[in-house]
């Protein structure tokens, strides 16, 4: 027979998600006045003497990256592709892996990873402000890659406590990456072209999320246990591309205070 959860109706869950998204949209629509906030930001910047570019340049996005900045942008975007290739392979295929390799019907492992990420977002932001985005992000990559590597040895009968600990590590590692990667991309922009750089980031991340289920599925058809090895390889490749990033970091608070 089929597992019990295979017969569940998921319509209520989707309905709740749709309702939450619609409520969020309504709140956003009636509480966020972007033109007003933009004017206030420009006025405050001018008052403090930190208005670095003209209104014309801001509107046209005319600011050009230097060669080194452009190289850093490409490396960051390559890293985004690589760690999304790794992480989303696991999130999209774990239910199949859990059933075929771990002998599990239904479990809360991915929920634990998400909960760990949510709890760690704020502390990670504080740490990033102290030691810089890049160092914090690199630590997150190591944590995520290590969790996936150890998980690749887990089999049916392995301790679920250990697996839950590994996914807690993965959740914290992923949160560390998420908190710091997008700001590193938009750090290279100016007011008028933040949208363009946001587009770069999401093009890279969504492209990876689109193709990695196909690639990981191909390797899992060959050998089902390849999922976590696949993810580990891509995550650690992202570590090496990030090593060469020289721009987009934040100045740690201590360094700022000493200026």
Predicted regions mapped to residue ranges:
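Intracellular juxtamembrane helix-capping segments at the cytosolic ends
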Residues: 176-190
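Helix-to-loop junctions at the C-terminal end of transmembrane segments
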Residues: 120-133, 220
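C-terminal ends and interior cores of transmembrane alpha-helices
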Residues: 142-157
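Short amphipathic helix-loop junctions that connect adjacent transmembrane helices
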Residues: 90-109
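Loop-to-transmembrane helix entry/capping segments in MFS-fold secondary transporters
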Residues: 189-201
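Intracellular loop-helix junctions on the cytosolic face of multi-pass helical membrane proteins
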Residues: 1-90, 241-259
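Hydrophobic core of transmembrane alpha-helices in multi-pass small-molecule transporters
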Residues: 161-176
């Amino acid at each position: 027979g089929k597992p019990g959860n295979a017969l569940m109706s998921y319509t209520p869950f989707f309905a709740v998600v749709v309702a939450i998204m619609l409520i969020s949209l309504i709140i956003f629509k009636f509480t966020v006045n972007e033109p007003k906030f933009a004017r206030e930001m420009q006025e405050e910047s001018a008052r403090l003497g930190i208005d670095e570019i003209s209104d014309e340049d801001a509107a046209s996005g005319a600011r050009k990256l230097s060669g080194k900045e452009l190289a850093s942008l490409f490396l960051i975007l390559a890293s985004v592709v690589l760690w999304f290739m790794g992480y989303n392979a696991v999130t999209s295929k774990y239910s199949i892996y859990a059933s075929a390799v771990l002998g599990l019907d239904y479990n809360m492992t991915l929920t634990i990873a998400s909960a760990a990420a949510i709890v760690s977002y704020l502390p990670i932001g504080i740490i990033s402000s102290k030691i810089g985005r890049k160092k914090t992000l690199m630590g997150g990559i190591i944590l995520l890659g290590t969790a996936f590597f150890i998980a690749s040895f887990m089999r049916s009968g392995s301790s679920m406590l250990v697996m839950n600990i590994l996914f807690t590590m993965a959740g914290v590692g992923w949160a560390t990456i998420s908190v710091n990667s997008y700001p590193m991309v938009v750090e290279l922009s100016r007011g008028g072209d933040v949208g363009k750089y946001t587009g770069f980031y999401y093009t890279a991340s969504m492209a990876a999320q689109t193709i990695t289920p196909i690639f990981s599925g191909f390797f899992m058809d060959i050998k089902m246990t390849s999922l976590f090895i696949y993810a580990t390889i891509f995550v650690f490749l992202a570590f090496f591309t990030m090593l060469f990033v020289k721009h987009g970091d934040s100045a740690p608070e201590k360094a700022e205070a000493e200026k």
